[in-house]
């Protein structure tokens, strides 16, 4: 009986130590603030990149940013993994005509760009957001809620 309690307690400690460490994200994905992220070095236009993300676990979307800290995390994640300088993000007004929205439906409460084009990308070396023609090809990051 004592051994059972010891083993059960040990398993509980392991479980609790893994929670919040990315254990909720699939292999190859990185965890931040309850979401999972994965950069893809496969240049695609914006619509194809969003479609590709939807085929990933939990129907992910192109990355959305809710804070400067989250944007910094993603830039640090992409810097060593992506060869491309420009990376798609999920913010566009492609389907909404002058009504910018994140492809994952997240609220637009953090912005860092000048509105000129229908799609946005960020530089993989810092968090500067750039207006891009949606038919251009860029690397991209997919994101889903863990």
UniProtKB/Swiss-Prot annotation:
Tissues expressing the protein: Expressed by the venom gland.
UniProt-annotated location(s): Secreted
Main location: secreted
Cysteine-cysteine disulfides: 25-36, 53-142, 119-134
Cleaved signal peptide residues: 1-23
Function (record text): Elicits platelet aggregation by the binding to the C-type lectin domain family 1 member B (CLEC1B/CLEC2). Binding leads to tyrosine phosphorylation in the cytoplasmic tail of CLEC1B, which promotes the binding of spleen tyrosine kinase (Syk), subsequent activation of PLCgamma2, and platelet activation and aggregation. Binding to GPIbalpha (GP1BA) and alpha2/beta-1 (ITGA2/ITGB1) may also induce aggregation, but this is controversial.
Subunit structure: Dimer (non-covalently linked) of heterodimers of subunits alpha and beta (disulfide-linked).
Name of the protein described by the UniProt record: Snaclec rhodocytin subunit beta
Keyword GTP-binding: no
GO molecular function, one term: toxin activity
Residue ranges occupied by any C-type lectin domain in the UniProt entry: 32-143
Family under the similarity heading: Belongs to the snaclec family.
Keywords: Disulfide bond, Hemostasis impairing toxin, Metal-binding, Platelet aggregation activating toxin, Secreted, Signal, Toxin
InterPro entries: C-type_lectin-like, C-type_lectin-like/link_sf, C-type_lectin/snaclec_domain, C-type_lectin_CS, CTDL_fold
UniProt keyword Signal, yes or no: yes
PROSITE patterns on file: C_TYPE_LECTIN_1 (PS00615), C_TYPE_LECTIN_2 (PS50041)
Segments crossing the lipid bilayer: none
Cellular component terms (Gene Ontology): extracellular region
Pfam families assigned: Lectin_C (PF00059)
């Amino acid at each position: 009986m004592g051994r059972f309690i010891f083993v059960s307690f040990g398993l509980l400690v392991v479980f609790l130590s893994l929670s919040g460490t990315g254990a909720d994200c699939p292999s190859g994905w990185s965890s931040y603030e309850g979401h999972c992220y994965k950069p893809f070095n496969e240049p695609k236009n914006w619509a194809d990149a969003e479609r590709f993300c939807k085929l990933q676990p939990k129907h992910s979307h192109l990355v959305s940013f809710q804070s400067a800290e989250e944007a910094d995390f993603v830039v640090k994640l992409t810097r060593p993994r992506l060869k491309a300088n420009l990376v798609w993000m999920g913010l566009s007004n492609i389907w909404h005509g002058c009504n910018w929205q994140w492809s994952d439906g997240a609220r637009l409460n953090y912005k860092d760009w000048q509105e000129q084009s229908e799609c946005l990308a960020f530089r993989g070396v810092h968090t500067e957001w750039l207006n891009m023609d949606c038919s251009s090809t860029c690397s991209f990051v997919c994101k889903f809620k863990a």
